């Protein structure tokens, strides 16, 4: 087996910026940001726009999640 070809599998905090939900899990995602977790340790931070904490399918609530302004751009373009 070749040495040093496998990705670094480590503890990472995922932060759903839409619902302000954070979860500590393991991943190979690379990031430069870090955050101090509840246990006092510092972990790499990966920000995501949507997760099961904010997705309408999992929450049962229908709400529009638009983080890049696409809905406003569409409504302005096709407004009557």
UniProtKB/Swiss-Prot annotation:
Name-wise, this protein is Large ribosomal subunit protein bL31B
Cross-referenced SUPFAM superfamilies: L28p-like
User: What family name appears in the similarity comment?
Assistant: Belongs to the bacterial ribosomal protein bL31 family. Type B subfamily.
What species is this protein from?
Stenotrophomonas maltophilia (strain K279a)
Please, which domain of life does this record's source organism belong to? Bacteria
What gene is this protein a product of? rpmE2
Pfam families on file: Ribosomal_L31
According to the record's subunit comment, the protein's assembly and interactions are:
Part of the 50S ribosomal subunit.
Q: What keyword terms does UniProt attach to this protein?
A: Ribonucleoprotein, Ribosomal protein
Q: Which GO terms describe its molecular function?
A: structural constituent of ribosome
């Amino acid at each position: 087996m070749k040495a040093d070809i496998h990705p670094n599998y480590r503890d990472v905090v995922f932060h759903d910026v839409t619902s302000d939900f954070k979860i500590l899990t393991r991943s190979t995602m690379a990031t430069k940001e870090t955050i101090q977790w509840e246990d006092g340790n510092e972990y790499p931070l990966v920000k995501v726009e949507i997760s099961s904490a904010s997705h309408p399918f999992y929450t049962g609530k229908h709400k529009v999640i638009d983080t890049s302004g696409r809905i406003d751009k569409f409504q302005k373009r096709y407004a009557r």
